[in-house]
Each structure stands twice: as structure tokens, then as C-alpha cells.
């Protein structure tokens, strides 16, 4: 476990899968659901994991995982982050940071968690996102809970919806990750994406993931 247990892991699993036509979390890639791929990567690296979802989530019961509803269904990922922060406060948790992971991106490398730990020690920003191949990955980030009030205000009163717009307003810093032969941040939105992911699983991982 992390020696400095001040980060809560949050899996944002709330997005309605309009393009997929079914609940993406339960789609199988190899012998695991997309959500299980993500959970198996992070479960041993965090003391506690929160899943934010606007529909029921079917996972094997694990003692360090809590599932909560998205308190603003359909307002996008910012609302999921806010739901997590509010839960954290209401339950008097001591975590100072929230690390977010999307539930539809099974190939990310767990080394990013070490990067988060390094960055939050610097304390030169309240928000960091991963950047790879010149692309910012707005759902792979670590957020200070000091942002709660402002996030709530901007979401409810100022109609912020896009993660990027809000992050730019806050002054996000990026964590640059070396590019790989394939994109570890490839996310699955469509049935075509799922076929691509199956290829990646075979070619890069020999189905071992």
C-alpha cells in the first residue's frame, strides 16, 4: 500500500453508453469486464477505492471498494468527481487527494500512480492530468479536495460541463508520460473500439492482463 495514504482512488463508471447501446462496464474483454480490468490494476495500490456510477455495478465484493451513485446524473465526469469529493467529506475521510480513473480504459500503466505521488508532494498545483503523445487525458488525473467548493459552484451555478474547460480555469498541470508503441490510454467507446482492444490484448499482452 501507499506509504502516504492520502489519495482515494475513484473509478468514474457513470457514463451512459449511448454509442455502445449497452452498459459498457459489463462488457467483456478477454475473461474480465472492462471495469474489472481497471479494478484489478488499482486494487492493491490504494487503501480504498470508490466507484461512482449512475447505474448498478456488478463486481465481486471487495472489502476496500465502495460504490456510490453519481449525485448529478448525466452532467458528465466533473459531476462524478464532485460526487466522490462530497462522499469523502461526508464520511470524514482523511484523504487530501482524489485520483480518477475511467472505467473504459483497460491498458493504462500503473506507473502513473507513482507519478501522482511525486507530483502531490511538490504541491505546485491542485490538479494534475496525464499527458501522452501530446494529448491530455482529462479523466486520468489527481485532484486536491481543496477544489470541492469551486467545483460545486462552477458545476451548479456556472454550468461548467467539460473537464478541460474547468481544468484550464483552475490551472491544471500535466504529467508527461513517454509514448508507447500503442496508446495505453486507448478507451473503448464503440463496438469497433472493442475489436481493436481485443487485438491489443492479443498482440501486446498475449491475453495476459
Language-model features and meaning:
Residues 207-209:
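Short, flexible loop/turn segments with low-complexity composition
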Residues 3-160, 168-184, 191-192, 198-205:
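Nucleotide and nucleotide-moiety/phosphate-recognizing core
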